Each structure stands twice: as structure tokens, then as C-alpha cells.
Amino acid sequence: MELETVLYRVEGNVGIVSLNRTKALNAMSKQIFVDLTTAFDAAEKDDTVRCVVVNAEGRAFCAGGDIPEMKGLDNPEAVFDFYNVAGIFMKKMINFVKPTITVAHGAIAGAGTSLLLAGDIALVSDDAMFMVAFGAVGLIPDCAGHWLLPRACGLNMAKELMMTQRAVKAPEMKEL
């Protein structure tokens, strides 16, 4: 399957979905959400796939939303369309019928944090660092971040991370 921003392959009984916008640190564009949905649809329909692993190519898991693309959304319909496509994928991943495992390395920011937490199991490398960076760009957590983060680390810690945009390194991540 050829996708523009995501690699998808099946190894044994595992569907492997890899973010592949390395020049943009795998920032979440509208196209990446479309491609993720397509890859998950393929994994869902393939009876040989028993679980799905989401990882990323390059030096970062995901730098968050594609801010230049988001700034270019110049009318309400375009904004709605972008977030609708994102929401369709996030809902699909959160409610996916097969187990999902996210495997992250390097920078994990904003929507990347939401993607990490949307999996049934999240694994991070020792070099991983995440930040709930929405406030730094004047947004509230999207991509279900406002719902996923409190479930992962508790309400008070989630509020702290959302309000301060404090970077959290892998060892502390495991404590949360």
C-alpha cells in the first residue's frame, strides 16, 4: 500500500504503521490523518493482522500538529475539515478492535502526545521526551489529548502538564 505520509506493512500478524514525514519531524498534517485512517482501515479488514504497532521514521516520533498548515486554514470550513479528519482517526484508534501499541522515540509533542496515549500500550525509548505543547501555540489539547492525558497520569498532573508545557523525559514518563 502506497501512502503519502505513512508507511504501512504487515510482518507476521502485526500491522506496522510508521509516520513518515521526517523533514517535518512527523508533524500531524491533514494528509497524515487521512493516511493513518487508511492504514488502520487496512489493518482492520486484514484478518491476519492481530495487532497494530504505531511508530515513526526519523529522529522524532511526532512534533505535534503541523502549525504552518494549521495557520493556513483561512476559513471556518477548512478548520472544521482539518479537525474533523483528525477526530475521525483519533476516534478510530482509541476504539480500534485490535490491540494497538505505540512505540515512540525522540520528541513527542502536542498531538504526538495524544497519538502516543491513544494506543492500548505505550512504549518509549530512553531518549524520548514529551511535552503537552498546545498552550505554547494558543490552543487547548486536541486530538483527544484533553481526554487521554488525565486518564494516563491523573487529573492534577494533567492540568500541570497542560498549563506549564513542561518537558518530561522518559524516566519521569514511566513514573507518571
Please give the residue ranges for each predicted region.
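Crotonase-fold acyl-CoA enzyme core
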Residues: 91-176
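Conserved CoA-thioester-binding segment of acyl-CoA-metabolizing enzymes
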Residues: 1-57, 91
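Phosphate-coordinating loops and pocket residues in cytosolic domains that bind phosphorylated ligands
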Residues: 27-30, 63, 72, 136, ...
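Hydrophobic/aromatic residues within transmembrane alpha-helices
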Residues: 17, 54, 66, 115-117, ...
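Hydrophobic alpha-helical membrane-association signature
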Residues: 32-35, 82-85, 115
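Histidine-centered beta-alpha loop that forms part of the nucleotide-sugar donor binding/catalytic region
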Residues: 20, 65, 105
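Glycine- (often His-adjacent) and acidic-residue-rich active-site loop
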Residues: 55-92, 108
